[in-house]
């Protein structure tokens, strides 16, 4: 196990990068990532954020989740901003994102950038609000821009 924060970050980068490559080789990276994210997020919410209560407003829920993630030491809340309403959230994620290294590597290799933060936020909204949200990375850069939009359940 890594003994430094930098070592842990490198381990996370390699894990996420490998997971994305495996997902792409299976043919449907978004579906695979959603399954992995949901499983991990449910456990994370139970263990690391047992008192987290999301507002019914998607924007407020994203802000609260980000602050709770900051308090748990997982990521920095000061590098993320959100605006929107109950059904649509626009966010900006800065340089302190723990997944930036993986996204940058994939971008530089000409591979699709799958925003793990957007995945996590859309899954958190689905779990906590029992509502389906589509995510989109509208711009990779400094900062990254994401959009989450409430959709109807598919039956």
Language-model features and meaning:
Residues 1-114, 131-145, 151-155:
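N-terminal accessory segment detector
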